[in-house]
Every structure is written in structure tokens, then in C-alpha cells.
């Protein structure tokens, strides 16, 4: 029997599949698919790669739509108008074509989604023909991976980051079953906030050097955002980065160093440190032998992993690669398939109800 795990956050969707009962995937790269979730709404609905396109506005692109599942919020105008439910269906149809249609499917979903939104995602998947077994929070999937790798702790602080926000979750794993004990989402620390902060920092350097604001013209502003995004994605690979801004009759180059990055993000880090300490103090009753499970994209924010480790001195930690998290989706799907109805409640609702607290953040 084939089983599949699908991991979704506000920026991307990923799937991985294999044979039930196997602990490892034989060909993980062949069975793994990933797509950015951003749709062009110009002439026809079509997918785009690269989240810099999100700067074009909600009338031209549909992006960061996952938090708005089950809502009437619209993107686009006229015939190209769409809602989050339809946008997600577009990507699930695309993924469904890449996995065996008889596969049993489970989802790993962000903490901020409510049970109602989770059920809606499962309904959309069932509508297109997927055999949905249930869902877990991606924090639970992270915790399962962390405990499996460390073998030292059953308590886990899972930290995730996407376009909507930064999520903190306290998960306890007992006899292989994850229990979400506490969680909080901080929209003010979403990935786009860090990218915009860096873009503004570079723009201010341009004003200081040549008295020209690159944010005034849309094309230059888009180029600025794109380079800031690329810089964030490669933040740990170099000690400095070159940024080039060009317009007709004007060009400027800058070198951004690690010292610049520290200065740029100091305010965000100070605010995050306060929130992190407050969460740990009030939501985690015991800090003995707790394990940190850090989502892969936290590495795109310089110093964030160090901050989390320093604030949990003595804790072991593991930073998950994308494949780790998606492999956990596969394990969850495998477990659900083999456990059968044990994972379902009396009315057939998904297993997410057993683990999820109604914690979701306000989507103002």
C-alpha cells in the first residue's frame, strides 16, 4: 500500500510518498515534489516560482493565502478573481498528479490554522480524489523527528517560520504519539517582515551614499526586494554580499556585511527575545532535558538559531532540513494508515482534533 505525506506552509507545498511499512524511502528525490505557492492572475491563473513576485499586489498575484482558507478574501479582479480555497486546490491537483492515486494521504499543517480550516483543507483534498487519513501540526512532525534523532528527551520546543509568522510550540511525545501542550504564533516575526526590514536597510544605505531612494520606482523597488530575499536565502554561506541597484543613468553597488545584518535586525531580535522568554517562562512547565526542533528556514534569518539555543542553554537541538520534515509527514501518513480507525474520533473527524489546541493567531 502506498502512503503520502503533504506538508504545507504559507509559502510552499511539498509531498513525499512511499510504501506503507517502510521506515525509509528508497528513492526520496524521485518521490519528493515541492512548489512555491504563488499564482499569477494576469491573463490566466498560472504558477510562479520565487516569492519576490508577491510585491506585485493582490490584484496581480495570489500569495501567502493559506491563513485565509475558509474565508471570503479575494485576490485578482474580474475573471481572474480567486479565493484561498481555489488557490490551494490548484496546487493540490498538481501534487496529486505526481503521487499514486491510491495512496493514503496525511497532512502536516501550520499551528495557526484552526480545526475548521484543517477540515476544509482535507475536504478540498478529498474532493479532488485524495484518500485523506488525517492531519498533524507540522510542530508535531518536527517533534517526532527531533525525538527520533536525539533519543534523549520527550519534550520538544518546535520553532517554525513562514510568510505568516513565527510559531513556538511545546510538544510532548509519549509512546510515539505527539501531544501539543502549548503554542503561540507571532505574525510580527513572519519571514516577509525580515526581508522587508533588510530591503529598507539597503534602501537607507542608498540614500546615505547617493541621496537616491530605490523604493520610489516600482522596478527598482522590485529588484531591491528580490536581492534582499536572495541575500536572506544565502545568509549563512558568505561573510559579505554585493547588492546592485540599477536604473536608467544610475547604478549603485553596496557590500552588506554580517555586521550590517546584525545592526539591521537588532530591533526585531530584541522584540523576539522578549516574546521567546515569556513563552518559555509561562508555557513550558519544565525545562529539564528539553529538545529544540528548528524548521529548516530559520537558517535564513541570521543569528536566529543562535538566539534560540542561547535562550535554552543546556538543551540539545536539531535543525531539520526540508527532507527531514517531509519525511516526518511520510511517517505520520504511514502511522495513520497502519493504525486505521484508532486515529479517528467517533464522527470520523481527522486526528488533528486530538492534538491541536484552538490557538490560531488573529488574521487582521
Which sequence ranges carry the predicted segments?
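Gly/Thr-rich phosphate-binding beta-strand-loop-beta motif of the actin/hexokinase/Hsp70
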Residues: 1-28, 32, 147-181, 198, ...
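Conserved phosphate-binding loops in N-terminal lobes of ATP-dependent enzymes
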Residues: 12-14, 22-108, 235-239, 272, ...
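Phosphate/pyrophosphate-binding loops at sites that engage ATP/ADP/AMP, CoA/4′-phosphopantetheine
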Residues: 92-105, 206-217, 272-291
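Helical "lid/coupling" subdomains associated with nucleotide-phosphate turnover
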Residues: 237-360
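Active-site neighborhood for divalent-cation/phosphate handling
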Residues: 84-146
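Conserved phosphate-binding catalytic cores of ATP/NTP-utilizing and phosphoryl-transfer enzymes
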Residues: 1, 132-161, 327-339
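Phosphate-binding glycine-rich/basic clefts of nucleotide- and phosphate-handling proteins
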Residues: 173-258
Amino acid at each position: 500500500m502506498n502512503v503520502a505525506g503533504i506538508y504545507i506552509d504559507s509559502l510552499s507545498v511539498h509531498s513525499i510518498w512511499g510504501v506503507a511499512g517502510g521506515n525509509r524511502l528508497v528513492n526520496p528525490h524521485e518521490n519528493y515534489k515541492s512548489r512555491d505557492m504563488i499564482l499569477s492572475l494576469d491573463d490566466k491563473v498560472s504558477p510562479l516560482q520565487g516569492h519576490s513576485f508577491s510585491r506585485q499586489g493582490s490584484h496581480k498575484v495570489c500569495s501567502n493565502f493559506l491563513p485565509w482558507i475558509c474565508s471570503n478574501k479575494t485576490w485578482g479582479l474580474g475573471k481572474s478573481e480567486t479565493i484561498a480555497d481555489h488557490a490551494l486546490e490548484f496546487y493540490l491537483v498538481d501534487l496529486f498528479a505526481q503521487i499514486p492515486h491510491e495512496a493514503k494521504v496525511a497532512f502536516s499543517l501550520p499551528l495557526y490554522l484552526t480545526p475548521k480550516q484543517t477540515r476544509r483543507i482535507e475536504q478540498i483534498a478529498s474532493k479532488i480524489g485524495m484518500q485523506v487519513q488525517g492531519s498533524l501540526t507540522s510542530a508535531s512532525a518536527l517533534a517526532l523527528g527531533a525525538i527520533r534523532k536525539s533519543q534523549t528527551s520527550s519534550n520538544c520546543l518546535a520553532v517554525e517560520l513562514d510568510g505568516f509568522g513565527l510559531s513556538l510550540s511545546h510538544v510532548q511525545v509519549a509512546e510515539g504519539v505527539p501531544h501539543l501542550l502549548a503554542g503561540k504564533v507571532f505574525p510580527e516575526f513572519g519571514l516577509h517582515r525580515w526581508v522587508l526590514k533588510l530591503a529598507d536597510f539597503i534602501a537607507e544605505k542608498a540614500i546615505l551614499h547617493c541621496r537616491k531612494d530605490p523604493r520610489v520606482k516600482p522596478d527598482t523597488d522590485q529588484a531591491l526586494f528580490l536581492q534582499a530575499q536572495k541575500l536572506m536565502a544565502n545568509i549563512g554561506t558568505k561573510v559579505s554580499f554585493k547588492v546592485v541597484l540599477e536604473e536608467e543613468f544610475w547604478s549603485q553597488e553596496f557590500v552588506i556585511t554580517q555586521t550590517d545584518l546584525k545592526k539591521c535586525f537588532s530591533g526585531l531580535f530584541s522584540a523576539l527575545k522578549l516574546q521567546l522568554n515569556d513563552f518559555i517562562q509561562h508555557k513550558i512547565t519544565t525545562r529539564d532535558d528539553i529538545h529544540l526542533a528548528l524548521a529548516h528556514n530559520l537558517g535564513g534569518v541570521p543569528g536566529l538559531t543562535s538566539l534560540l539555543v542561547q535562550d535554552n542553554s543546556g538543551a540539545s537541538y536539531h535543525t531539520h532540513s526540508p527532507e527531514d520534515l517531509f519525511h516526518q509527514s511520510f511517517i505520520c501518513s504511514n502511522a495513520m494508515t497502519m493504525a486505521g480507525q484508532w486515529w479517528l474520533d467517533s464522527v470520523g473527524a481527522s486526528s488533528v482534533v486530538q492534538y491541536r489546541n484552538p490557538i490560531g493567531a488573529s488574521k487582521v
